[in-house]
Amino acid sequence: MTAFLIRPDMPGFKVVGTVHKLGIRGSTQAELSYEALEVPVDHLLGAVGRGFGVAVHVLNAGRLTLAAGCTGGTKRTLNQMASYAEQRVQFGHPLADFEITQRKLSRIASEIYASDSMLGILASLVDRGDNDFSLEAACAKVFASEMVWRAADEMVQLAGGRGYVKPYPYERILRDSRINRIFEGANEVLRLFIALNGVQAPAEALKEVGSALRRPLRNLGLLSGYATSRVKLRLGQTSTLDIELHDRLRKHKEYFEQHVAELGSATDRLIIRHREQIVDSQLMLERLADMAIDLFATASVIARTQSLIDERGIETCEREIALCDLFCVEAGRRFRANRGMLDSREEEVDNTRRGVAGFVREGKGYFVTDAILEE
């Protein structure tokens, strides 16, 4: 793969026509045609055959900025939700008085706080010249793009019929938010990227251990090192947050470190169970990715909250601590749910899913016929 530049005035290049889109209609997309187009050598970006690296670098930056844009968009949506919930009265009360509305507002606020925290970590990596932030950027992009979509959906739901019609702005927010889960790499692909990067190192380590077990007397060092790391992992003594935390945050740190250990051991079990077929076990990889995303978000939230406490004092950080508490609890619940679905028993359910999908493919759609309903 080779990267190169194309100018609109180059012979053989043509814009076929613009594309009419569901949302983001303020920007123009078009179909492009290349016919017998010759690219001069000085139009190359990097060396021949090195275009993939250029693409990855561009995508990393794009995922970072897209996550930032989604976070800003979610803040604006939450502002509109808060305003509407106070103004709209039902049953003698503003919508903001009802617990279901409060759950919507609080979840979105805590997720904004988490997304902002992840972006802070990412920005610091960029500022210090760290070029390898592809995993963190992918995590932030997936998290933020799904957050902004949920917020847009909740805004439309909160507004009721007004959310579905013009001239109210809510239907446009929904339309404009949808593309973010596709831009800069579809979220399904990014989840596989996150998970496969996560299993690569453990898989290599397990291969080394497997080779060492064939000649144990010659490889005592490797085996003992691996055994020690596994024991520490079981005890939750690896991947700790090496920062001093206020007492209000320590419970979150303890759960975080426990969950990191559980993710590591769960990854090992999956590799042992599936071996080379792990790359095709997309549902299991998707769960691993979601666990990793929630762990990255949790670590970012804890670190940011402690930084604010250090800077401003505990007395002025009650709202931020509440956001931290809420996000860590809900992220922990999602983590444990996904961890439970890594069990071999879930594979039976996954097999059923594959079977039903096969029936859909064979029937070219819904496949159940019922004589009573057809009459």
Locate the predicted segments by residue.
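FAD-binding core of flavoproteins
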Residues: M1-K75, Q90, I182, A186-R269, ...
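A generic secondary-structure signal for well-formed alpha-helical elements
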Residues: P8, L78-V89, I112-G129, V148-A151, ...
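Alpha-helix capping/hinge segments and adjacent helical runs
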Residues: I24, N131-S229, L233, R319, ...
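Glycine-rich cofactor-pocket loops
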Residues: L45-T65, L78-S110, G120-A138, R162-P167, ...
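Alpha-helical transition-metal enzyme core signature, strongest for iron centers
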Residues: T71, K75-L78, L105-L119, A144-M155, ...
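C-terminal amphipathic alpha-helical interaction region
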Residues: G221-E375
